[in-house]
Amino acid sequence: AVQAMGDRHCAYVLYRVDIKDADMLDIKDLNKVYFDNVYVETKKPVAGGWYTDYIVDDGALYAAVSMDFRTDKVNRGNFDVTFKDLCSTDDEVLISKEWKVSIDLDYTPVSRRISSGRVIKVAGGRCRLKGIEISPISVRADFTRGRNVIMENISIDAVTLKSGENLADTSVSGGSSSGAFGRVCSMQFGKVVDIDDIESVTINGQTIRL
C-alpha cells in the first residue's frame, strides 16, 4: 500500500504492484493487464469497489480499493486485501493465483459537518434533513422520519462541483439505510476532491448549496 485516505465512514487505499518478467509472461501490451478480482476482508461489514490502472512510464500496476465500512469504528484496525488472478484483456489468464496483503488502517479523518434542518419533499409527504457530512471522498446525509413518508424514496441525486461536474456520475459506491428514527444516505466519490470545490448536494431534486 502506498497511500490511504479516509473519513469516519469510508476509505481509499492505493496499492502499487510491480510486474517483473513481462516478457516471460508474453505480455505485449502492459495496458491490458488487470486483476480478475480484488476484495477486502475485515471484521466489520464493508462494501466497496476497486479499479486497476497501468501507467506505462512507471512500470507498475496500481489497484485502488474503495471501502464503505457502514460503521465509524474501522479506522485504527486492520484488514486483508486479496488480489486474484492476473489477467489480460485478451481473455487470457496470465497467472491463476491469489495474493493476500494485510494492512493496518491508520489515518486522520477529514470531514465537515453542515447542519441543516431543511424540509425535503418526498413522495407521500415531507421529512427533515438533519445535516450533511462531507469529506474529500464521500458525502453522507441523515434525515428524521417524516409522517406518512416512504423513507426509501429519499436519495442523493447529485454532488456538483463549482466546475459543473457531477460526482454522482463517477461514484464508486453508495447506499442507504432506514430505521425507526430516520434514514441515512451516502455516496463515495470516484476521485479525491477538495471540499471547498463542492458547490451543492441535490437530494430528491432539491439542491442544497454548501
What does each of the following model-derived ranges do?
Residues 1-210:
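Alpha-helical, hydrophobic structural elements that either
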